[in-house]
Amino acid sequence: MERRDKINYYLDIAETVMERGTCLRRNYGTIIVKNDEIISTGYTGAPRGRKNCIDLGCCRRESLNIPRGQRYELCRSVHSEAHAIISAPRNEMIGATIYLVGKDRQGNLVENASSCAMCKRMIINAGIEKVIIRTGKDTYSIINVQDWIDNDDSLSDELGY
């Protein structure tokens, strides 16, 4: 058996974390890693104590026909990146890497996944250095967070997701 490379190893863990997700549209799993230690994990789901969409059987954004990338304030879920960030001390996130995996409701990999504008802001402020996103079974893209700072998509009409 061939040993799994480290990036896909961490992406596999993020994919397992994603299985806890409770969104009816898409679920994501995030892990934050620094110096080969997992600092925090997060998945898509309602805030603690609130009912999840899978328990309610409906998605408000879907019932209102809101397209992907718009009106996230109407969503019941906290995004996986946000869940992971709020569960970790900032000093442990500075210079860390986020590993992100997303799947749609049919269980297909979201190949063009990216963090939303709010999560990008949180990632920047947390001091995270890189975001690695699974694009296929063994493939991924690497984003240097500094690129999000230098190429501020909030100043254009490009939403980035």
Language model regions located:
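Zinc-dependent deaminase catalytic domain
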Residues: 1-161
